[in-house]
Curated annotation (Swiss-Prot):
Belongs to the GnRH family. Pfam families: GnRH. This is Progonadoliberin-2. GO terms for biological process: hormone-mediated signaling pathway; reproductive process. It comes from Aquarana catesbeiana. One of its GO terms (molecular function) is gonadotropin-releasing hormone receptor binding. Stimulates the secretion of gonadotropins. The keyword Signal applies. It is found in: Secreted.
């Protein structure tokens, strides 16, 4: 009888743990945790207008913000270039 109780308790614990592990986010093809989508995929009808307008190197939406931060910290010589890019972006809007 005591052995059956231990077995029942073990099964209950395993069931509880397995249900907690299965609550993870389902990853669809091309999607990453947090709803972030891979941008290197071919264009689809779901692509927003902002992404469609961003087809050059100067697009702020497709840039990695960490890269920009690192560039700004390491070298201040690009300030004029950054100001020109910002001015062009403001003119486009």
């Amino acid at each position: 009888m005591a052995c059956q109780r231990h077995l029942l308790f073990l099964l209950l614990v395993l069931f509880a743990v397995s249900t907690q592990l299965s609550h993870g986010q389902h990853w669809s093809h091309g999607w990453y945790p947090g709803g972030k989508r891979e941008l290197d995929m071919p264009a689809s009808p779901e692509v927003s207008e902002e992404i469609k307008l961003c087809e050059g190197e100067e697009c702020a939406y497709l840039r990695n913000p960490r890269k920009n931060l690192l560039k700004n910290i390491l070298g201040r010589s690009n300030q004029k270039k950054n100001a020109d890019v910002l001015a062009r972006q403001l003119q486009k809007k």
